[in-house]
Amino acid sequence: MDVYEGKAKKIIPLDDGKVIMEFKDDATAFNGEKKAQFRGKGWLNAQISAHLFRVLEASGIKTHFIGVAGDNRLIVERLKMYPLEVVVRNVVAGSLKKRLPLEEGTELPEPIIEFYYKNDDLGDPMINQYHARVLGVGESELKEMEKIALQVNDVLRKYFAERGIILVDFKLEFGKNTRGEIVLGDEISPDTCRFWDAETKESLDKDVFRFGKGDLISAYERLYERITGEAPVRR
């Protein structure tokens, strides 16, 4: 079984229907044009993802998370992944402000769901249900992903709000397990979400690196401490 290495993670298959997901210290932005390494980033993303998966599981949302397998490793259920990214937006930011005549920071009257085709060569283009069908993803599967994505949003938006954080937007990925269930996969971390401090509107996510807003590790550590109630130990 081959090890897959992406920009931010290694996927190491095991022979018991499980996978090791190893988080790297690498940071990339703008489709890999900007790159750097930050010691401790992998640990922070692994621990934040594990914590948020537990929050979702406690709310009845099925994920691929099984447990923590070391500082920067999670054990997860092996899934047959869909070639899609599902983006949920609560506040105008990022690419959305270029597509709608709304100011950055405007709270949306309801969440916006977007689908993107995962393909680096094509720049991960936005697609609709017709494109998805051509890619082999049925309408019922899309509706199930959308339903779960909105459930995730309801749980996490409330969870973060209680901790003084705005969940601006986030990316999810889904796969199908051996029982034919559509399950939340990948990660939920400041690499894949936009988090703003509710008072200052400071970024607590990868935008800190993307736009040179400050120290990435400090931002991730602040997020970790807010959501877990524990001070992180520098790695």
UniProtKB/Swiss-Prot annotation:
Keywords tagged on the record: ATP-binding, Ligase, Nucleotide-binding, Purine biosynthesis
InterPro entries with a match to the protein in the record: SAICAR_synt/ADE2_N, SAICAR_synt_PurC, SAICAR_synth, SAICAR_synthetase, SAICAR_synthetase_CS
Single annotated GO MF: ATP binding
Domain of life: Archaea
Gene3D superfamilies in UniProt: ATP-grasp fold, B domain (3.30.470.20), Phosphorylase Kinase, domain 1 (3.30.200.20)
UniProt xrefs under SUPFAM superfamilies: SAICAR synthase-like (SSF56104)
Enzyme Commission code: 6.3.2.6
Record family assignment: Belongs to the SAICAR synthetase family.
Name of protein: Phosphoribosylaminoimidazole-succinocarboxamide synthase
Lineage of source species: Archaea, Methanobacteriati, Methanobacteriota, Thermococci, Thermococcales
